[in-house]
Amino acid sequence: MQIKENKQLCLISLGCSKNLVDSEVMLGKLYNYTLTNDAKSADVILINTCGFIESAKQESIQTILNAAKDKKRGAILIASGCLSERYKDEIKELIPEVDIFTGVGDYDKIDIMIAKKQNQFSEQVFLSEHYNARIITGSSVHAYVKISEGCNQKCSFCAIPSFKGKLQSRELNSILKEVENLALKGYKDMTFIAQDSSSFLYDKGQKDGLIQLISAIDKQQALKSARILYLYPSSTTLELIGAIESSPIFQNYFDMPIQHISDSMLKKMRRNSSQAHHLKLLDAMKQVKESFIRSTIIVGHPEENEGEFEELSAFLDEFQFDRLNIFAFSAEENTHAYSLEKVPKKTINARIKALNKIALKHQNHSFKALLNKPIKALVENKEGEYFYKARDLRWAPEVDGEILINDSALTTPLQPGHYTIVPSVFKDNILLAKVLSPF
C-alpha cells in the first residue's frame, strides 16, 4: 500500500528492546510516513505498549491518555503491543480514546489496519523474520536481533507466557540472513534478544541452539561485535559460557537474571533451578577474562522472609555484579504468586533501599576499573554540541552506562563505529574518554 509522503507519524515505543524490534517492523511497513516526535502535529500516533508489570502498565496507559489529549483533529491513535494483547477483552471500553487496537500478532499488518481503520488481534504471536523490513532507530551501527518469542518457563511471578505464548524459535538461517542484510547496511554491532535466549531452539528439540548461533555468526564474519541478553539459569550451561568466551565476535557479556539466590525462594518462585546451579554458572562467568556480569533481582516476592532476604543481600555484596536491576514484586493476574500472601510494601521498600546501596557500590567499582586503560568501544552518535556518545563493547545499549568523548580533543570528526578509547574520568555515572584509534 502506498501512503502519502506528506503524512506524519509519531511512534512511541515503550518497554524492552524486544518491543523496539516490533516497533521497527511497523516502521518498515509505514516507511512513507515522515517521522516526528511531536504528537500534536502527527497524522498517526502509534504507541507500542508494555504490559509486563504494574508500573509498565500505568506508563502505557498514561502515555495513551496524553497522546489522546494532544492529537489533532482527524489524527489516528493506535495502541499496539503487550498491554493491548493482555487486556484485549476490556481495553476497548476502558480507553475509548484509542482509534485502533492491536496486540502482539499483527505488527506486519499495521499499514492495512490504518487503511481500514480497524482493530486486529491474531492468535499467533508475531515473530520478525529476515524478510520483514525494519527501520532501525537510534543508531547507524547497532541493531537488535530477536531470535525467539514466548517462553516455556513457569515462573510464579511472570505473566509473559499468558500473552506471549510458548517458546517459538526462529530458524537459524533466517537469523543469519537478517544479520547479513543489516551488516551490509553498516550495522556491525548487534545484540541478540529473546524472552529466554538460552532456550533458543529448545522447541525444535535442540538443546545447543544458542551455541549453534554463536558458531554460525563467528563463521559468517559479518559482524565486528555482538552480545546476548536474557540468559535463563536452568537452560544456561558451562558449554554455552565457554562458547561465548571463545568467540571472536561475542563479547564476554553475561546477562542472567537470577531473581534470588536462596534455595527456598527459588522454589517459591518456580525458577526450576537451584542455588548450587546459579553459583556454578556465575563462578564460571567470573572466571572468564574481562567478563561483564549483569543480573536482575526481585524483592518482596510473597513469603520472602527476613532470613532469605539476608542471604540474598550477603550474596550480592560478596559476588559484586557489574550491574544489577532490582525490582519490587508486582502482583500480576494469571500468575501463581498473584493470590499468595504479600510482603508489606514498607518492608519491600526498606529491602530495596538496602540492596540499591550494595548495587551502586559495586557498579561504581566496575566503572572505575576501566579508568586509564585502553578499551574497545562503539561510538554511536553526537551527544549534544560537544561530545560523542560511546559505550564499552561489552555493554548493552542504554542500560549499562555511557562514555562521552570531548570533540575538542579531536582533529577530525568521528564517524560512528569501533574505536579503542581510554576513559580518564568517572563522574555522575558517566565516563569521559579520549580516542586512541579505530579498529
From Swiss-Prot:
The chain positions of domain MTTase N-terminal read 7-119
Q: Which GO terms describe its molecular function?
A: 4 iron, 4 sulfur cluster binding; aspartic acid methylthiotransferase activity; metal ion binding; protein methylthiotransferase activity
Q: Which reaction does it catalyse?
A: L-aspartate(89)-[ribosomal protein uS12]-hydrogen + (sulfur carrier)-SH + AH2 + 2 S-adenosyl-L-methionine = 3-methylsulfanyl-L-aspartate(89)-[ribosomal protein uS12]-hydrogen + (sulfur carrier)-H + 5'-deoxyadenosine + L-methionine + A + S-adenosyl-L-homocysteine + 2 H(+)
Q: What is this protein called?
A: Ribosomal protein uS12 methylthiotransferase RimO
Gene3D superfamilies assigned = Methylthiotransferase, N-terminal domain (3.40.50.12160), tm_1862 like domain (3.80.30.20)
Q: State its role.
A: Catalyzes the methylthiolation of an aspartic acid residue of ribosomal protein uS12.
In the record, biological process GO terms are: tRNA modification
Q: What is its main location?
A: cytoplasm
SMART domains for the chain: Elp3
Bound how, and how many: what does the cofactor note say?
Binds 2 [4Fe-4S] clusters. One cluster is coordinated with 3 cysteines and an exchangeable S-adenosyl-L-methionine.
